[in-house]
Design a protein with these regions (language model features):
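Catalytic cores and adjacent flexible loops of soluble metabolic enzymes
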Residues: 2-329
């Protein structure tokens, strides 16, 4: 087959997946898969929080609006933390008041304590998130308290949110490995996830913060968590440090999880885990899901364009393999 013909076939197949076409059916080779997956876009918050150069507010707003226009149903917009700790998020109020806020899109914000929750409410936030850990060492270095103490702090936020009618999402970091203590017990992950859910978190996102997970360790962790909580209240949040993120997500899908966190252009990392590379790229997750025939309601091409936009502003290559590959076709 000639190169020109091969390239033409590649363009056709890629165009099918970019458009959300079902190139492949739900085959038994992959096991049971959800027919629809909800993507939670974390790029504007988790993706940008580590950038040393402050990203202009209008750029953040433009990025969020582009992602919303692409059909992403949940976009984590910003974080109501002290600018002393995360300077990049100092413009949280301006961001929340400037984005378009489409009626079919949720714009949750991170609120680590009651002060942050109150500030978020004053800025018009309609959903918030809290952030905990399954690693005692990570919890102490990240939020300067034990896991038990962090849960107590979150209770204030949960109580205030309940009174205000605000839904709360929970994050559990270091679900398979910790940069300080190594392996993390699946039983501990299950314990923390259940406590968050019992407190009132409608959804608990399980984060492989430093990206050391494999399908084997992710499966073992999920087996433990699924003994305590149904798959319908769980989400998977993977980093791609060792190139395992998509395989890990597929494993979670096969086990019944149907919510996936991802970051446009693979932006982000963790300010407390220096070796961790970016979150799994939204574009790459979409390409895999669409190729499996799973509905997302998201326009992949528009997400690619949003990723290229923010990467031009940041002056860095796009971290999405799909975005990079399609730019060469």
């Amino acid at each position: 087959m000639g190169y020109a013909r091969l390239k033409g076939l590649l363009r056709r197949d890629v165009a099918t997946v970019l458009g959300g076409g079902r190139s492949y059916s739900h085959g038994t080779a992959f096991g049971a898969l959800p027919r629809r997956v909800k993507l939670v876009e974390v790029g504007p918050r988790d993706g940008l929080q580590n950038e040393k150069v402050i990203v202009p507010t209008d750029v953040k707003v433009d990025l969020i609006n582009r992602l919303a226009d692409a059909g992403l149903p949940v976009i984590e917009a910003t974080s109501f933390v002290s600018p002393k700790w995360i300077p990049q998020m100092a413009d949280q109020v301006e961001v929340m008041r400037s984005i378009k806020k489409l009626p079919n899109v949720s714009y949750p914000v991170l609120t680590p304590n009651l002060q942050g929750f109150k500030a978020a409410m004053n800025a018009g936030a309609k959903e918030v998130a809290i952030f905990g850990a399954a690693s005692e060492s990570f919890s102490r270095k990240n939020i300067n308290c034990s896991i038990a103490e962090s849960i107590e702090r979150f209770q204030e936020v949960m109580d205030a949110a309940r009174v205000a009618g605000i839904p709360v999402r929970g994050y559990v970091s270091c679900v398979v490995g910790c940069p300080y203590q190594g392996n993390v017990s699946p039983a501990k992950v299950a314990e923390v996830a259940k406590r968050m859910h019992d407190m009132g978190c409608y959804e608990v996102s399980l984060g492989d913060t430093i990206g050391v997970g494999t399908p084997g360790s992710i499966r073992a962790m999920l087996v433990a968590v699924l003994h305590e909580l149904p798959a319908g209240v769980l989400a998977m949040h993977c980093h791609n440090t060792y190139g395992q993120a998509l395989a890990n997500i597929l494993t979670a899908l096969q086990m019944g999880v149907s919510v996936v966190d991802s970051s446009v252009a693979g932006l982000g990392g963790c300010p407390y885990a220096g070796a961790a590379s970016g979150n799994v790229a939204t574009e790459d997750v979409l390409y895999m899901l669409h190729g499996l025939g799973i509905d997302t309601g998201v326009d992949l091409q528009k997400v690619i364009e949003a990723g290229n936009f923010i990467c031009r502003v940041l002056g860095r290559p796009n971290g999405s393999s799909v975005a990079t590959a399609t730019s060469k076709l």
